[in-house]
Amino acid sequence: CDHLDNRGHAGPRHLIHSDLGRVEWRQSLPVCERLAARLGVELVVVRRQAGDMMDRWLSRWEGNVARYANLACVKLILPWSTPSTRFCTAELKSAVIASAMRRRFPTGDVVSAAGIRREESSVRARMPVWRRDERTVRKSGMGHTWNPILGWSRADVINYVRSRGDRLHEAYTTYGSTRVSCAFCIMGSEHDLRASAGCADNVAIYREMVELEVLSTFSFQGSRWLGDVAPHLL
């Protein structure tokens, strides 16, 4: 917002959060609400109408089993998202957010600012600072994605948050996570999975996800069973 103010931006600004339901850290929405209040902007919360992230995994498995039973396919596929098929991001975040933005802003240009950084992955390291976003292009307006902190380090982010008198998500400050996404992420490190399991709020979804591992016989991550992360909780 400081940069936009300095550039003389006078258009509407909103924060938008796609809530993934049971798999979210419980503090994620309050963190967004606190940020919106500090910036003085409206927080728009969107959700997938057909159910949350866990519902998506469950329905994917149930549909696959039904096809297999009806001889419509020759092998079962895993219920989970994977690094190469991240429908968790595509369907429950990007698509839902883009749809909400098109409805809210039927005309004029839309700039979607995201907080990704090059340090986070090799894929993000290759992303441009600015690009056309086809998901938010409308007949009467262009769509763009802007990654304003692409070159920031983790320390830069922490220092900026503190300089504004705000505080970090409890996943960092209380449980020692190195990154925050879903409580249990298909791309999360073993350290972060264990950190998440240490939060009492995440125990119920942990057990539900392990139950799907058992039912499907597919591990949550290719080389790691979620059930092995915190077996004492089962």
Task: Locate each region found by the language model.
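Nucleotide-activated chemistry modules centered on ATP-dependent adenylation/adenylyltransferase
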Residues: 1-234
